[in-house]
Each structure stands twice: as C-alpha cells, then as structure tokens.
C-alpha cells in the first residue's frame, strides 16, 4: 500500500510538467510558485491539479513495478493489484484510468 502526503507529491514533482493539449506547463521550477497560482493559470481547481499530479505519480510507480521482474508472475500481478487498490478492475480499465491522467 502506498501512503504519501500532498507535500510528498509536490516535492517529487516540483520539476515536472503539466500537459494540457499539446503544450507543456511547468508545474514549478521556481520555489516561490504556489500550486494555487498554477491552478489559476491553468483555469483549474487546486484539487484538480493535485489529483492529476497524484495520478501521474501512481502511474509512474505502477509502470516501474510492472517492468520489475519480481512482479511478472500471477502472484506478482496480484500483489500489484492490492498495492494499488486495483483488485476489482480489469487491465483495460486500469489502462484507461492512467491514460486519462
């Protein structure tokens, strides 16, 4: 199970990008930039910005785990589904969730 705070996510993603249409928006390369200001620039709610960052964070972790050899058998898949709380949805549904991130 993954436990992290919004602060953990912001710290991890402070030099990452927000993708909207075909443009990339810098989330934060300047320490003084507040995420609420970024949300205003993107015309988004603050929570939507954080939610998207969290989904991207989970997606990267999930993909890393999928390609980890220790998770390549049936038992490994079950462990991953439990870790990400995805036991009750199909692989196709998981893919759709992450594509919308």
Give the role of each language-model region:
Residues 1-101:
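Intrinsically disordered, low-complexity regulatory regions
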């Amino acid at each position: 199970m993954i436990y992290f705070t919004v602060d953990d996510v912001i710290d991890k993603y402070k030099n990452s990008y927000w993708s909207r249409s075909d443009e990339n928006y810098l989330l934060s390369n300047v320490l003084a930039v507040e995420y609420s200001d970024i949300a205003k620039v993107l015309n988004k709610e603050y929570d939507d910005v954080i939610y998207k960052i969290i989904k991207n964070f989970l997606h990267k972790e999930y993909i890393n785990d999928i390609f980890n050899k220790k998770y390549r058998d049936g038992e490994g898949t079950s462990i991953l589904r439990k870790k990400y709380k995805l036991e009750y949805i199909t692989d196709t549904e998981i893919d759709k969730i992450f594509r919308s991130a």
